């Protein structure tokens, strides 16, 4: 019994430390993936707002192809006037332009660009970036489906790595204790 307690005392701090490190690695990679999901939309929203501020027409900054956001990972753009009314959109949800949260537009009106995870319905999650322009707002977005698949893979790999490290450290400690007992005997 004393040997088991000794093994637990040696292994438990290692188990806790490795759990913390695996969690830190997972969170770092997950956040990197999620923040990277905004990169194309930042450029799209900023470029469209610049063009609109320079006098371009609303239709010229919105892609002609419609994107059914429930089924596609393609990026899309929605342009709103200053009251939040949709002026043009390349996004549809079941054939209609989805409603975007007015609170986000209010925030952007006061603070500037915002990056928001938007879920217009269950199972449809979008990485969106909203940029103000002189007469309203430009929102660029795309599906998080692929990013979330990668996050799940990283979560699984982190869990497997943690279990492997726990098993390896436990085996080393047990073997070390057994060898030490034989030498003492």
What are these regions (language model features)?
Residues 93-159:
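Extracytoplasmic
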Residues 1-40, 131-185:
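Alpha-helical transmembrane segments of membrane proteins, especially the N-terminal anchoring helices
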Residues 42, 46, 51, 61-123:
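Extracytoplasmic ligand-binding sensor domains of the Cache superfamily
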Residues 14-16, 20, 28, 64-67, ...:
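Short, well-ordered helical secondary-structure segments
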Residues 7-10, 26, 75-77, 88-89, ...:
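Broad hydrophobic/π-residue packing in well-ordered secondary structure
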